[in-house]
């Protein structure tokens, strides 16, 4: 049997894992990206994208059965009739918790980013200064200016555009 050797192995093809694999590959590392879920093809795998609210059986709302079967996932704002197929089913993959902690999961290429409208806004200088300004929690070890060039790098790659307003 042929042995496969990799310089880097990335587990999870969510937003961070996918980006890490891209960066390693572009630097010439032989990279293996492992994902437990399916690939999500644009348009084809978004069966509800072009549906209007009145076209859903429950007008986009959850049923009592949905909530009963998914007590954790159903607490997420995005777990609705139009997107619940991207969430891991709580009964099939139960949570083990010592203390309450709502952690949603999505097993597919893109991970949870597919479940929260694929939107991420830049934090501002104000956001990074919160702990120091408000006098609680642990201060950030970096500031906005440290991340700004990386924000620009990623935004250029993914095609972010628009006004600064």
Regions found by a protein language model. Give the residues of each.
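A structural-propensity feature for long, helix-poor, extended segments
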Residues: 150-158
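Short, glycine/acidic-rich hinge or "gate" loops at secondary-structure transitions
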Residues: 42-45, 161-165
């Amino acid at each position: 049997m042929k042995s496969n050797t990799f310089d880097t192995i990335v587990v999870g093809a969510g937003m961070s894992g996918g980006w890490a694999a891209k960066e390693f590959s572009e630097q010439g590392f032989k990279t293996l990206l492992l994902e437990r879920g399916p690939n999500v093809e644009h348009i084809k795998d978004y069966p509800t994208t072009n549906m209007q609210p009145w076209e859903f059986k429950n007008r986009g709302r959850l049923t009592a059965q949905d909530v009963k079967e998914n007590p954790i996932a159903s607490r997420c704002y995005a777990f609705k009739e139009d997107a619940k197929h991207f969430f891991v089913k709580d009964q099939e993959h139960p949570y083990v918790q010592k203390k309450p902690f709502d952690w949603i999961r999505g097993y597919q290429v893109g991970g949870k980013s597919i479940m929260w409208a694929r939107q991420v806004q830049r934090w501002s200088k104000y956001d990074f200064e919160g702990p120091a300004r408000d006098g609680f929690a642990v201060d950030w070890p970096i500031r906005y200016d440290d991340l700004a060039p990386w924000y620009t790098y990623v935004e250029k790659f993914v095609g972010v555009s628009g006004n600064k307003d």
